[in-house]
Swiss-Prot record:
CDD domains: ASKHA_NBD_GLK (cd24008)
Residues reported in the UniProt entry to bind ATP: 25-30
Gene designation: GK1
UniProt organism field: Trichomonas vaginalis
Catalytic activity: D-glucose + ATP = D-glucose 6-phosphate + ADP + H(+)
Name of the molecule in the record: Glucokinase 1
One Gene Ontology molecular-function label: D-glucose binding
Pfam families: Glucokinase (PF02685)
Keyword vocabulary terms for this entry: ATP-binding, Glycolysis, Kinase, Nucleotide-binding, Transferase
An example Gene Ontology biological process: glycolytic process
Similarity annotation: Belongs to the bacterial glucokinase family.
């Protein structure tokens, strides 16, 4: 549950007979994070931290408790807009969260189930998690804090330029899955528009027989296909560009190195990344493959959507930043190795280097947008 001591700060925002606020919520694999902000000034906010929840019932209990604590602190509080980021396809304002385990009915959430005092009718919005992250990129740009959190990769091949392109920007992130969203700016629209996608589910484009990494890649792809598809179908990028994908890659390279087949339940993706950064060979090869295919996915997405910039974002990118920089030349080779090389010359790639919760920024941004929407 969230601390009432942090909530006390909202009392400072009261101006008249009521205290209008906005609420942004990011639901992750282990729970949720919430930001409360002043409706009149989004620069005034309080981040309540993390609360555990891995079932719908647990999430609702946390939010109902939060609603009670807010009213206990200031009974005149009214929420004018709310946005909540979730992992999974959203249909008819309902989502089955894909980063929680268990039966579907225990991880199904509808917007009508949320406490009305925090999520007002017609002023509340579900966001796909990467959609929220993309709106967070927009929010960070508008607050002039975007550039300081990223480094441009491959500067010997691409021109310098803004992270948030004047036209189209692809925002990608690896976590429990592989998310991708498109940010587009056009004179026809007052504000940038985010298009959520499911492009992480594109099937992998394999290299052909004379490529120097053909044999190794084919064996890895086959290993992943054997696990998920009975060895018949080409895996999707998310099958390797995700936490579960890193587990499978490590299982493959560990067996190749030692002959031992480790059960997946004994492999922790976070530990693999740490071992890779420390230079352990099987983990290094696994994390390298994880990122090679990530850049291949980024290449497919950026070229297909005619993007000027490509943003590799969120916490795992920051944690793995030293490794990314260590293999940057290999990643550059992968990204620019394309059947239409002239298409790649103007695409800029950026990697997040410091922690900034773009999902919370994005949900707060959209909460204020919906709160200020004309009736």
């Amino acid at each position: 549950m969230f601390s009432i001591d942090l909530i006390q700060q909202i009392k400072e925002w009261k101006r008249g007979s009521t205290l209008p606020i906005c609420l942004g919520c990011d639901v992750g694999g282990s729970g949720l994070r919430v930001r409360l902000s002043d409706f009149h000034d989004s620069a005034k906010y309080v981040d309540l931290g993390h609360a555990k929840a891995q079932k719908t019932a647990e999430l609702l209990k946390v939010l109902e408790d939060l609603q009670q604590k807010i009213l206990q602190v200031e009974p005149t509080t009214v929420c004018l807009g709310a946005a909540i980021a979730v992992a999974g396809p959203i249909k008819n304002n309902t989502v089955i969260l894909t980063n929680w385990k268990g039966p579907a009915e225990e991880r199904t959430l509808s917007i009508t189930q949320l406490p009305k005092g925090l999520f007002p009718k017609d002023r509340s919005y579900f966001l796909n998690d990467l959609e929220a992250g993309a709106y967070g990129v927009i929010a960070a740009y508008e607050q002039s804090i975007l550039e300081e959190n990223f480094v441009q990769l491959f500067t010997d091949r691409a021109p310098t330029g803004p992270i948030l392109a004047k036209g189209r920007t692809a925002v990608l992130a690896m976590g429990s899955g592989l998310g991708a969203a498109l940010v587009t700016r056009t004179p026809l629209l007052k504000n940038p528009l985010v298009l959520p996608t499911e492009l992480g589910h594109l099937q992998i484009a394999p290299n052909m027989a004379t490529h120097k990494y053909f044999q190794d890649e084919q064996e890895l792809i086959q290993h992943i296909s054997d696990h998920y598809y009975g060895g018949k179908l080409d895996p999707e990028y998310e099958d390797i560009c995700s936490g579960r994908g890193l587990q499978l890659a490590f299982q493959f390279y560990h067996k190749k190195l030692t002959g031992e087949v480790l059960p997946l339940e004994q492999i922790d993706a976070g530990d693999v990344a740490k071992k890779a950064i420390a230079g352990e060979k099987d983990a290094y090869n696994a994390l390298r493959a994880h990122y090679i295919f990530y850049l291949r996915a980024a290449k497919a997405i950026a070229t297909s959507l005619s993007c000027e910039s490509c943003v590799l974002s969120l916490d795992n990118q920051v944690k793995n930043h030293p490794f990314v920089m260590k293999i940057a030349k290999e990643l550059e080779e992968e990204f620019y190795e394309f059947i239409r090389p002239d298409w790649m010359t103007s695409v800029r790639v950026y990697s997040q280097k410091s922690i900034l919760n773009f999902n919370i920024l994005g949900t707060d941004y959209m909460a204020h947008a919906i709160a200020n929407k004309p009736q």
